[in-house]
Design a protein with these regions (language model features):
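Hydrophobic helical membrane-anchoring modules
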Residues: 2-3, 179-327
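Short conserved micro-motifs on helix faces and helix-strand junctions that flank
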Residues: 11, 70-72, 160, 233, ...
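Residue-level recognition of specific faces of alpha-helices
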Residues: 39, 54, 64-67, 76, ...
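Solvent-exposed polar/charged
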Residues: 60, 85, 111, 115, ...
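Acceptor/aglycone-binding surface of glycosyltransferases and processive sugar-polymer synthases
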Residues: 68-72, 76-86, 100-178, 199-218
């Protein structure tokens, strides 16, 4: 029997005090599942603390860990893509660097894969996030249902396992706006959930700010669906029809009673409202056009500054590589 290989991909940001514990838990857990070989890919998303120095130490200590450092902060999803592109496991497991996603329950995700699912997401009965982060998750869930057709009963989190063919399909996306959930849903709908316990954060606070969450929502809103453009078209047709009908009504009313005032205030309110709607629609269309331009302009999905592995050997120290586009 050929031993399956598991690749763990962990995006790291401000995790100098937590990543060692996560790695140790993975090692302890995998020691109890001897039927799998495994390796780890730790991606430093240009963290301002000593995260990459800790990763470098771990790479020197263990020969199945590879450390990747990005040239600037590209975001969690781009960091995941960097790790996925380096991984070569039959099954890839993605999890967080803060210890909130329980590595000791990875067996549940692997069992789901072995039972036939292409992707298995961890689901939490209760989350130990701030109210702000939980609101962001709720909004993201609504958006993925509307834009990407996600089933209502499916829970999507940052802790999941995927088969190799799903990862390979995700990696065919080379533009600079990666959205992991959209890439997964585009590859397969054979997705299941397994219940796991969501832990409290070991130290620190979430790296997601309002700006980052808004960017993530807008990315998912526009990257994998033209539904917003269709909504814009329907809205425009609706307002045009309403304006035409109101115009006929005004003319008829004037003929019936010539002394009725036309209503300057109502007219201005309608003009301002419709003008605002037009600006929103133009902005949305402009966002799509801007993304097309940036993608054509070969903006990188991420840039690798340094990579360490193979028991501490440096593989690309100081190199700047555009991994998002390959000629």
């Amino acid at each position: 029997m050929v031993m399956s290989k598991i690749s763990f991909v962990i995006p790291c940001y401000r995790s100098a005090r937590t990543i060692e514990g996560v790695v140790a838990e993975i090692q302890d857990t995998m020691a109890s599942i001897p039927e799998y070989a495994y390796d780890m890919f730790l991606v430093n998303d240009c963290s301002p603390d000593d995260t990459f120095e800790v990763i470098r130490t771990l790479c020197a200590k263990y020969d199945n860990i590879t450390g990747i450092s990005l040239a600037r902060n590209f975001g969690q999803h781009a960091a995941l893509m960097a790790g996925l592109r380096r991984s070569d496991g039959d099954i890839v497991v993605c999890l967080d660097d803060d210890g909130q996603t329980p590595a000791n329950e990875v067996g549940k995700l692997l069992a789901g894969i072995e039972n036939g699912s292409d992707v298995v997401y961890a689901s939490y009965e209760s989350k130990h996030h701030s109210a702000f982060r939980n609101f962001g998750t709720w909004m993201n869930d609504i958006m993925t249902r509307m834009m990407l057709g996600k089933p209502r009963e499916l829970h999507l989190t940052s802790y999941f396992a995927a088969r190799r063919f799903v990862v390979d399909s995700m990696l065919r996306y080379e533009n600079c706006y990666p959205y992991i959930i959209g890439l997964v849903l585009r590859a397969t709908r054979n997705i299941s959930n397994v219940p796991v316990t969501h832990r409290s954060r070991m130290v620190g606070t979430s790296g997601y700010t309002m700006k980052k969450l808004l960017g993530l929502w807008f990315n998912g809103f526009t990257a994998f669906s033209i539904l917003p453009l269709r909504i814009t078209t329907v809205t425009g047709i609706t307002f045009a029809a309403a304006g035409f009908i109101y115009g006929i009504y005004t003319v008829v009313k004037k003929f019936v009673n010539p002394h009725v005032p036309l209503g300057f205030s109502a007219l201005m309110a309608a003009v301002v409202f419709i003008g605002g709607m037009l600006m929103i629609m133009l902005g949305l269309i402009g966002e799509y056009i801007g993304r097309i331009y940036i993608s054509i302009n070969n903006s990188p999905q991420y840039v690798v500054k340094e990579e360490v592995g193979n028991n501490g050997k440096e593989c690309g120290n100081g190199s700047v590589v555009n991994e998002g586009k390959k000629g």
